[in-house]
Amino acid sequence: MAVSKNGKYLYSIEDEGVAVFKRDKNGDLSRINSVNIDGMRGCFLSTDVDGKYLYVAGYHDGKVTVVHTHKDGRLGSLMDGVFHTGLGSVAERNFRPHVNCVRPTPDNKYLCAVDNGIDQVKIYRVNKLRNKLELVDILRCPRESGPRIISFSMMVSLLIFSLNSVMRSGLTNMMEAVRFRRLN
């Protein structure tokens, strides 16, 4: 689930898409609408800094999906969807892409897609004029590290792996992610 930037709407994953609910003063939820994401069920949601897009991570199909959102809370059309390709290094993950987490950088310039299956973080630019995700960089994580979640704060960017290590940077610009160092 994810909450809109204004706190009025709750986004949720459904079998083949995403739904949005309006939160009333009592905390009750009323469904507004839903959209199909043209892929398998997502596993992680986030919104951009401006609240104009909903990002969906697809673990089962390795897909990153972007959905337009409207000021009145409605979900709009699909902006773009990108399937990751490649082979991973851990047999238990079936050697294929599994997008675990999608989150925009704090400056809203890039979308980071953490892929547990292929040990990578793909960094996209959201081209709002062309309605496309454009791959601008790839952070290749150590083999079998299983990156899971990326998180940002004002001072630190964290990339969390399969419960055994964390990569940390004092830089908030993910384009400098290559300078991350592994901490055990």
Question: Where are these predicted regions, by residue range?
Answer:
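Residue-level detector of Asp-centered blade-edge/turn motifs that repeat once per structural unit
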Residues: 3-7, 49-50, 106-107, 154-156
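Short loop/turn segments immediately following the C-termini of beta-strands
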Residues: 15, 59, 69, 116-117, ...
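Structural signal for beta-propeller blades
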Residues: 18-20, 62-65, 119-121, 167-169
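Short loop/turn segments immediately following beta-strands, especially the blade-tip
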Residues: 21-28, 66-76, 124-132, 172-182
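Asp-box/WD-like beta-propeller blade repeats and closely related beta-sheet repeat scaffolds
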Residues: 31-101
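Acidic, glycine-rich loop-and-beta core segments that form the ion-binding/anion-interacting portion
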Residues: 138-184
